[in-house]
């Protein structure tokens, strides 16, 4: 452990030294000395030196406006470098990476050792593996793309420096390159000047595919294949690719008026253009490599006389021509030109697959398997994973938008007001229209702008090549009519295939009603016939936690999944649960392996579909090697969950969870909704108001422009509390509920649940992770600097509650200190705290100055505003998540 960790420490220290030299070159010795003094005070303060803590506060409070920005940038950039070193450490042979590829091998060995499992059963489970990762733009990657690219290059330098065999001049060249990259980062503005548009966000997603996933996915499949061969003597079929990527960028219009039908059409075209671009590069390499002459009669017949001398090249050159013609046509469409479709326009995956697979079969048959299983196999697997669309998109819209559209239509038709009908009347109308052969939309109707947008979105889905759109997600779904309404709107748009329509249940009440809603739907003959035995349901993590607190939300999520699994099993329906998890704990985030094994038994039978959000995409898929590691973790967790499902919870455990849920929800809502001081306290103790100024995502921070916490999106809600280190949404209510149940004499039962039930132990593990990142003295400092004295009592009450929570969780988990079983994460947090603490203190000071100027009616000082934005980005880097 320590030896592994020393490699990380030495990289962090080396990068820190290069950054220090860069600062000295750019701004002189004085600023560097100031930064170094602050760092030493912070380190000593962390070690418990109270005098140095006070000196740290005084030093940061006394910085002049000219010193603010360089100091904030120094610590913020250091944290970005530390995160880069840590990401490299996770894949480095000297660090965590030493055990990464082993994760699949370990799982396969564990499964083989189970007397009740034979190799055939394990093989079947492998063949039914299905993993769909849905990339989303929120909670908005706070780091600019240009800096992410530079950090990727820093990573590459660290990798090469790890090679013992490099000679001195190569080492010197690499160190020079590192100095250049860190200097480039220092002289680059780390804060975007403008909000990204939905198209910018989509391009960011495509960049992840190009820079990491394109190489990472085939390498992961090679790794999986090798482990299967070694442990089961089984090879993956060529056409078996268990992983798919979907995106919400350009498709998610829930609360984001910037995502229109036109934008969705544009992003779909852009995605296809990027796919042709990447496949062209692959085909070019294959044309160069596959110069072989010998081929099967089938391939020779395919290429005819003209291609007999170099059959593989001949076939691939034809494919290259198709790709080029398709790319030119897409380019014209993106520029708004309407050209006739060229012959052989690529719109379906088979058009790519067939010629490539013909080459593969011929090479194998002619004894050239070693060549077939090289670049060609990688390209075939990319066709299966990415294909013509590159990434499919989900369309997401809020349920009320569909209701309003149908209300407008029925009023126009003079048949009443759909919006005011009872649920039974709505269902009767929808089923009647779904069964009807005549169109419902009159040609003469001119709908409002909002309704046109809903109808145009359905039309965009219908016009897209089949397979480009993965699902239609209905947020805030509450009733069967919410689902039927979307099916009707798609029917009216002329859809010719069964697109999965997934209701998203995301508040506590909606999660509790989810099974009733789905049971009613499955009892409708038209619906049962239409879905052809398959149903997708999305479980919302962020909004349910914001609505009821993490303990009540996580239990509602578990129960909803459990009931849905049983209902669908009974009805003979294959259920895919789609998990809308965030990166942060307050929005359902958790280490993948633990999170999946803590779900109800049977929850992964229909595969795993999960959102990968914002900055977590970079941490988990930012490099090809990290992609291999992340996909391997998911694979082993799905296999384990399906073959060795967690136990069904005992009735007594369910009763305790019901109790914990009720107590924690009451306490959480008692503060967040009912305490009149809470919203003013939240607004002043956190940078919530200032976060709106950060040009993060394309989506507004609020669903509605006015209103309190309930109208705020889950992401800024979490982001704000992460900044002031109280991290309140991730724990409020949970510990107090545990305390009450312990007082009722049930501690032994809780300890048993922690030991024997993965769901419960994961909950406590996630609380420990949060507690290791919170900081009571910093949260108190924010109060003193920013909150009116009459609200201090509330802050004190919350901090005392938190202290009690930490004690009770440690007692139930039988741990002497936080993160006892994950020392590597605890070390990592401690290392970053030395650099995050000054940013937090500085942020409180900057908020104080900025708000004071506003109160006095003075013009905001741009140096203060810029430094404030840098501290927000820096703290996010230190905490390893935004929202």
Swiss-Prot record:
One of its GO terms (cellular component) is cytosol. The gene is ppc. Forms oxaloacetate, a four-carbon dicarboxylic acid source for the tricarboxylic acid cycle. Belongs to the PEPCase type 1 family. Its cofactor is Mg(2+). Keywords: Carbon dioxide fixation, Lyase, Magnesium. PANTHER family: PHOSPHOENOLPYRUVATE CARBOXYLASE (PTHR30523:SF6). GO terms for molecular function: magnesium ion binding; phosphoenolpyruvate carboxylase activity. One of its GO terms (biological process) is tricarboxylic acid cycle. NCBIfam families: PRK00009.1. The active site is at residues 138, 546. Disulfide bonds: none annotated. Its EC number is 4.1.1.31. This is Phosphoenolpyruvate carboxylase. InterPro entries: PEP_COase, PEP_COase_bac/pln-type, PEP_COase_Lys_AS, PEPCASE_His_AS, Pyrv/PenolPyrv_kinase-like_dom. It catalyses: oxaloacetate + phosphate = phosphoenolpyruvate + hydrogencarbonate.
């Amino acid at each position: 452990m320590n030896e592994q960790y020393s490699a990380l420490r030495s990289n962090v220290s080396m990068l820190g030294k290069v950054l220090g030299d860069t600062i000295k070159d750019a701004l002189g010795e004085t600023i560097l000395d100031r930064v170094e003094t602050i760092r030493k005070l912070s380190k000593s303060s962390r070690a418990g030196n109270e005098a140095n803590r006070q000196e740290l506060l005084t030093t940061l409070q006394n910085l002049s406006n000219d010193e603010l920005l360089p100091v904030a940038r120094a610590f913020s950039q250091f944290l970005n470098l530390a995160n880069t070193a840590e990401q490299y450490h996770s894949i480095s042979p000297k660090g965590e990476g030493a055990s990464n590829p082993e994760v699949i091998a370990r799982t396969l060995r564990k499964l083989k050792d189970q007397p009740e499992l034979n190799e055939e059963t394990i093989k079947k489970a492998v063949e039914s593996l299905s993993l769909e990762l849905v990339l989303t733009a929120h909670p908005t990657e706070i780091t600019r793309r240009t800096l992410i690219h530079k950090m990727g290059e820093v990573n590459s330098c660290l990798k090469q420096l790890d090679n013992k065999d490099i000679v001195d001049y190569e080492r010197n060249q690499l160190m020079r390159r590192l100095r250049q990259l860190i200097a480039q980062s220092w002289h680059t503005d780390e804060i975007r000047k403008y909000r990204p548009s939905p198209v910018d966000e989509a391009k960011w997603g495509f960049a992840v595919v190009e820079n990491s996933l394109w190489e990472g996915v085939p390498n992961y499949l090679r790794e999986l294949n090798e482990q299967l061969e070694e442990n089961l003597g089984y090879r993956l079929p060529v056409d078996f690719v268990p992983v798919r990527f979907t995106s919400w960028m350009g498709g998610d219009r829930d609360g984001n008026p910037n995502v229109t039908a036109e934008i969705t059409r544009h992003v779909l075209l852009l995605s296809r253009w990027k796919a042709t671009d990447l496949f062209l590069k692959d085909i070019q390499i294959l044309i160069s490599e596959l110069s072989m002459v010998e081929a099967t009669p089938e391939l020779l017949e395919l290429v005819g006389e003209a291609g007999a001398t170099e059959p593989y090249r001949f076939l691939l050159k034809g494919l290259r021509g198709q790709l080029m013609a398709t790319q030119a046509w897409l380019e014209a469409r993106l520029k708004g030109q309407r050209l006739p479709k060229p012959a052989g326009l690529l719109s379906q995956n088979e058009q790519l697959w067939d010629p490539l697979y013909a080459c593969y079969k011929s090479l194998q048959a002619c004894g050239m398997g070693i060549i077939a299983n090289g670049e060609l196999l990688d390209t075939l697997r990319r066709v299966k994973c990415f294909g013509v669309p590159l990434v499919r998109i989900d369309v997401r819209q809020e349920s009320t938008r569909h209701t309003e559209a149908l209300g407008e239509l029925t009023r126009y038709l003079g048949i009443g007001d759909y919006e005011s009908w009872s649920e039974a009347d709505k269902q009767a109308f929808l089923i009647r229209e779904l069964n009807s052969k005549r169109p419902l939309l009159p040609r003469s109707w001119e709908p409002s702008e909002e309704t046109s947008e809903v109808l145009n979105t359905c039309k965009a889905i219908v016009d897209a090549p089949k397979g480009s759109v993965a699902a239609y997600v209905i947020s805030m779904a509450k009733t069967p009519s919410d689902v039927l309404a979307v099916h009707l709107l798609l029917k009216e748009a002329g859809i010719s295939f069964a697109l999965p329509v997934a209701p998203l249940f995301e508040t506590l009440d909606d999660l509790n009603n989810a099974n009733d809603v789905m049971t009613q739907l499955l009892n409708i003959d038209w619906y049962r016939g239409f879905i052809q035995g398959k149903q997708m349901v999305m479980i919302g993590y962020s909004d349910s936690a914001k609505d009821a607190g993490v303990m009540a939300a996580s239990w509602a999520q578990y129960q909803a999944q459990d009931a849905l699994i049983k209902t669908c099993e009974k009805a003979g329906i294959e259920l895919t649960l789609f998990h809308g998890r965030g990166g942060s704990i307050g929005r359902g985030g958790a280490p993948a392996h633990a999170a999946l094994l803590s779900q109800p038994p049977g929850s992964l039978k229909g595969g795993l579909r999960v959102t990968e959000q914002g900055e977590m995409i970079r941490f988990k898929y930012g490099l090809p090697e990290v992609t291999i590691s992340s996909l391997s973790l998911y694979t082993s967790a799905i296999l384990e969950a399906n073959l060795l499902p967690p136990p069904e919870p005992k009735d007594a455990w369910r009763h305790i969870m019901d109790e914990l849920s009720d107590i924690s929800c009451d306490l959480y809502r008692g503060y967040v909704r009912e305490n009149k001081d809470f919203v003013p306290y939240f607004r002043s103790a956190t940078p919530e108001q200032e976060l709106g100024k950060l040009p993060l995502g394309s989506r507004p921070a609020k669903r509605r422009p006015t209103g309190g916490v309930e109208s705020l999106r889950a992401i800024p809600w979490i982001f704000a509390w992460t900044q002031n280190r109280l991290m309140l949404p991730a724990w409020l209510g949970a510990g107090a509920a545990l305390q009450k149940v312990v007082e009722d004499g049930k501690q032994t039962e809780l300890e048993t649940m922690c030991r024997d039930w993965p769901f419960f132990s994961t909950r406590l593990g996630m609380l420990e992770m949060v507690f290791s990142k919170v900081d009571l003295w910093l949260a108190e400092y924010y109060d003193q600097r920013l909150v009116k004295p009459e609200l201090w009592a509330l802050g004190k009450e919350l901090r005392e509650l938190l202290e009690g929570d930490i004690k009770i969780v440690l007692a139930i988990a039988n741990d002497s200190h936080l993160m006892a079983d994950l020392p590597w994460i605890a070390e990592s947090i401690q290392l970053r705290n030395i650099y995050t603490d000054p940013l937090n203190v500085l942020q409180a000071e900057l908020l104080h100055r900025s708000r004071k100027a506003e109160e006095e009616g003075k013009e905001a000082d741009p140096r203060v505003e810029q430094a404030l934005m840098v501290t927000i980005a820096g703290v996010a880097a230190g905490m390893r998540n935004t929202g």
